[in-house]
């Protein structure tokens, strides 16, 4: 099953040493995948200070990634997504076991977004999540949904999809 999953990753075997231990992770908040691990945006000119030229793409909550290395200060991971590899801040992902990783990604209950941008309602303890077109969301089962709403002390709103996001 691992080989099948890794076959989806572009150029997986090129340049990756056999002795590198691969960890598994899931994105827990919308975040930037960067070419270089800089905390602040690196702009082209002073007129565009917030146009970060080191940003490769944006990752959405719940996306699967492979973790290869940690930075020296341990606040960045070098990761691989299907078509990109780069650096991501450690606060934007959660390391999970191999079993959890595959269980989450092989879930039969999924929803593919067809709108350009979608966001969840803001909850005081969690916040608000932003998604983009094409994101695959794993839906929570009935037990997980009831547990969440019991913990939050609120009722389940009709017509909503309970999304499972790694926290």
Ranges and model annotations:
Residues 1-34, 38-50, 57-60, 68, ...:
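Boundary regions of SH3-family modules and the immediately adjacent low-complexity/disordered segments
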Residues 65:
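Mid-sequence acidic-hydrophobic segments that form the walls
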């Amino acid at each position: 099953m691992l080989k099948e999953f890794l076959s989806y990753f572009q150029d997986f075997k090129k340049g990756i040493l056999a002795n590198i231990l691969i960890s598994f992770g899931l994105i827990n908040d919308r975040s930037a995948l960067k070419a270089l691990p800089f905390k602040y945006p690196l702009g082209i000119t002073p007129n565009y200070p917030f146009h970060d030229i080191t940003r490769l793409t944006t990752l959405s909550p719940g996306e699967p990634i492979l973790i290869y290395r940690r930075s020296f200060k341990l606040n960045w991971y070098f990761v691989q997504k299907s078509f990109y590899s780069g650096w991501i801040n450690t606060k934007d992902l959660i390391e999970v076991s191999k079993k959890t990783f595959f269980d989450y990604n092989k879930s039969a209950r999924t929803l593919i977004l067809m709108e350009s941008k979608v966001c969840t309602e803001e909850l005081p303890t969690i916040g608000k999540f932003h998604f983009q077109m094409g994101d695959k969301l794993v839906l929570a089962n009935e037990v997980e949904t009831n547990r969440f709403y019991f913990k939050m002390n609120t009722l389940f709103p009709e017509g909503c999809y309970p999304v499972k996001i790694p926290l």
